[in-house]
């Protein structure tokens, strides 16, 4: 955790009121440092069947829950001897409360991974009809996925080609997850990596306080607005 996140966490967990400067000084004394985020490369070229305009247009503000959802897929590596293997995480993030609405983990970056993530989100939020924003990954530009959005009465929005900042909060979430959980260790077991991801996602939604959410967790903020 960085000094800002550490300050929020200490103050909430122990009901104290330390300022960021004091926490930063204590972290320096204890040699506690946050992990730097790494740039992500995760491209699969494809010919899109369906494209959509960038309706979101970097307007990352939302006035209510289920108004705007962002989605993406990221990869994780683990090691079996000298062999490098991968798993993939697909997730949907709500821009209002920054909660992870749904997620799926799989061994392939394929259509079922993304479709199942979407289906789970719709099942858990049957009355939600958000603007649905993604990059131009092959899953999101397929006719099947486009039809799923139509059936759920959702508008589709897509980032411009090569503009990952158009999906900035989603990219930011991947950076938080990996810097706080993944980069801290080398995983040598698929099951251990999957368990670590699941634990972190539960922690993020229910235990990780955010300054932008009035120092509440995503689920606290979500329930407070309900």
Identify the residue ranges that each predicted region occupies.
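Basic, flexible linker segments flanking DNA-binding modules
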Residues: 1-64, 163, 217-226
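Mobile genetic element proteins and their domesticated derivatives, centered on retroelements
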Residues: 6, 23, 27, 56, ...
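RNase H-like polynucleotidyl transferase catalytic core
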Residues: 36-41, 131-136, 150-169, 185-188
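An active-site-proximal beta-strand-loop segment
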Residues: 58, 62-101, 107
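Active-site beta-loop-alpha junctions of metal-dependent nucleic acid enzymes
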Residues: 85, 104-125
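Short small-residue beta-strand/loop micro-motif enriched in glycine and branched aliphatics
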Residues: 97-103, 156-159, 183-184
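C-terminal domain-tail junction helix/linker
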Residues: 143, 150-154, 176-226
């Amino acid at each position: 955790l960085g000094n800002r996140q550490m300050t929020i966490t200490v103050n909430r967990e122990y009901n104290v009121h330390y300022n960021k400067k004091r926490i930063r000084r204590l972290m320096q004394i204890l040699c506690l440092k946050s992990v730097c985020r790494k740039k992500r490369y995760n491209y699969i070229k494809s010919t899109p069947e369906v494209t959509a305009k960038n309706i979101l247009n970097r307007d990352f503000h939302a006035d209510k829950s289920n108004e705007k959802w962002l989605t993406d897929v990221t990869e994780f590596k683990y090691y079996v001897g000298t062999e490098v293997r991968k798993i993939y995480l697909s997730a949907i993030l709500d821009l209002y409360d920054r909660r992870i609405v749904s997620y799926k983990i799989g061994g392939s970056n394929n259509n079922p991974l993304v479709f199942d993530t979407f289906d789970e989100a719709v099942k858990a939020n049957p009355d939600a009809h958000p603007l649905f924003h993604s990059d131009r990954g092959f899953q999101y530009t397929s006719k099947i996925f486009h039809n799923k959005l139509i059936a759920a009465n959702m508008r589709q929005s897509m980032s411009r080609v090569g503009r990952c900042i158009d999906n900035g909060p989603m990219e930011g979430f991947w950076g938080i997850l990996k810097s706080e959980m993944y980069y801290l260790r080398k995983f040598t077991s698929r099951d251990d990596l999957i368990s670590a991801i699941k634990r972190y996602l539960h922690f993020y939604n229910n235990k990780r306080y955010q300054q932008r959410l009035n120092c509440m967790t995503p689920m606290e903020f979500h329930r407070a607005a309900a």
